[in-house]
């Protein structure tokens, strides 16, 4: 979110400003230009939809590496080290906290949550009800995937669950970035 990168056709800026400037196409172009990542599709879910989806699944299980004490919506939260069962609201807070850890840790937690939601949906046969889920969550989700596209991706989803080694997560490590103060703002990125 705080990476200061080149936005094709827009100059240097924080990566999280790309979509707001020119939509998902600029964000995809920015990822490709700076990181070599080609984005084929996108899915964005709002907070209300995220909470509802996790609750519909009966919550998710997360292995928390270390104790986290922070705030979420101005309320104190604590996540002890070890296996945690999270409802939708707790999962959203777990994904968002970063004051007592770092933005890099937050990204790893978000990857954990995506994995846990995906795995739970597949093991509960949620993918079989993809058409119903697609329509019932439409108000919470922004995507360029049509229902037909989602249905065509279902065999891949089943494959991934049975072959988790085929999924690779990448996080930019601290040693691969430099701290920079944005001129005229004092913002550190």
Task: Give the residues covered by each predicted segment.
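Non-catalytic, solvent-exposed segments at the cell envelope interface
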Residues: 1-189
């Amino acid at each position: 979110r705080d990476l200061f990168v080149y936005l094709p056709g827009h100059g240097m800026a924080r990566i999280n400003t790309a979509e707001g400037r020119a939509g998902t196409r600029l964000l995809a172009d920015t990822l490709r230009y700076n990181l070599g990542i080609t984005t084929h599709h996108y899915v964005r879910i709002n907070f209300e939809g995220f909470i509802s989806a996790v609750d519909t699944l009966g919550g998710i299980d997360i292995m928390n590496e270390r104790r986290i004490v922070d705030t979420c919506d101005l309320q104190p939260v604590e996540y002890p080290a070890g296996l945690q069962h999270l409802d939708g609201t707790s999962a959203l807070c777990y994904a968002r906290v970063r004051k007592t850890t770092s933005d890099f840790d937050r990204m790893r937690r978000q990857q954990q949550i995506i994995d846990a939601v995906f795995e739970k949906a597949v093991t509960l046969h949620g993918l079989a009800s993809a058409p119903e889920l697609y329509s019932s969550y439409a108000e919470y989700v922004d995507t360029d995937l049509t229902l037909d596209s989602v249905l065509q991706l279902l065999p891949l989803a089943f494959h991934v669950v049975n072959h988790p080694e085929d999924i690779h997560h990448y996080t930019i490590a601290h040693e691969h970035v430099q701290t920079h103060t944005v001129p005229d703002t004092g913002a550190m990125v």
